[in-house]
Design a protein with these regions (language model features):
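Short, Lys/Arg-enriched N-terminal segments with co-localized hydrophobic residues
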Residues: 1-15
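Non-catalytic, conformational "gating/processing" segments within enzyme and secreted inhibitor domains
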Residues: 135-136, 143-148, 152-165
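Flexible, glycine/charged-enriched surface loops at secondary-structure junctions
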Residues: 121-123, 139-147, 232
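Residues in intrinsically disordered, low-complexity segments of regulatory proteins
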Residues: 9-10, 55, 138
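Helix-start/capping segments and mature chain N-termini
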Residues: 15-128, 132, 161-232
Length: 232
């Protein structure tokens, strides 16, 4: 998917009332050789709030910044959170391309359903993503093996400790210029078939992209790395 021209995007975003606050101070951009994976972040982020009875509201693009959460927020205690991951690339013709981003937002909603999180408007999410990338376009690296990693995610923000679905959430999108996920680049990786520590069982949350699934994989991954494997 090509990123649409900025005038068209701005018109559509304006009709959806996404507020835009541009960063007054731009960050220095890292060299392509130092990128690694997920260490650096662009100048802006997208935020959308949810309140029970009001729905999703106040979509906005703002300068990248820390967020403030109550220590009792449900995301910390019960892991009610979902996320996605996709990339944007620059072609030799200087076009910005996305690969089936609508499928990522569709999958995000499937994860939402499993974690009792309200469904997001996939068209709004896609338009917000396009606008965010347009604003931070200069952050997309063009060296071989590099790209702009896109991380959409939702967190439960209610600040009480009963085990129940939250009534408030935040949906955010952040961007990170990246190199290869593995130190060896695009070369083959050594994979261990883990038989003791698992992240998915029948009836569980394995089909959802939720933080707890990845936390449960860390032990097996740690042991595999110690034995010289790259992944489990």
């Amino acid at each position: 998917m090509r990123i649409l021209n900025i005038k068209a995007i701005c018109w559509r975003i304006f009709n959806m009332k996404i507020q835009i606050e541009l960063a007054s101070n731009k960050k220095a951009k890292p060299e392509a050789t130092t990128l690694g994976f997920g260490k650096y972040f662009t100048d802006h982020m997208f935020i959308l709030d949810y309140t029970e009875g009001k729905g999703w509201h106040d979509p906005r693009i703002v300068p990248y910044q820390p967020i403030t959460l109550d220590p009792a927020s449900k995301v910390f205690h019960y892991g009610q959170t979902v996320f996605e991951g996709l990339k944007a690339y620059v072609t030799e013709a200087n076009e910005v391309l996305l690969f089936r981003p609508q499928s990522n937002f569709k999958r995000l909603n499937l994860s939402n359903e499993r974690l009792c999180i309200p469904e997001i408007d996939e068209e709004l999410a896609l338009e917000a993503l396009k606008q965010l990338i347009t604003i931070d376009r200069e952050w997309i690296p063009n060296a071989p093996g590099t790209s702009l990693y896109i991380r959409p995610f939702i967190i439960a923000t209610d600040s009480y400790l009963s085990v129940a679905p939250s009534q408030t959430y935040q949906f955010m999108i952040i961007l990170s210029p990246v190199g290869s996920y593995y130190a060896g680049g695009i070369n083959p990786v050594k994979i261990l078939v883990e038989q003791q520590y698992v992240r998915a069982v029948a009836g569980g949350t394995g089909e959802a992209k939720t933080g707890g699934n990845y936390a449960s994989s860390l032990k097996g991954q740690e042991l595999a790395n110690a034995d010289g494997f790259d992944q489990t």
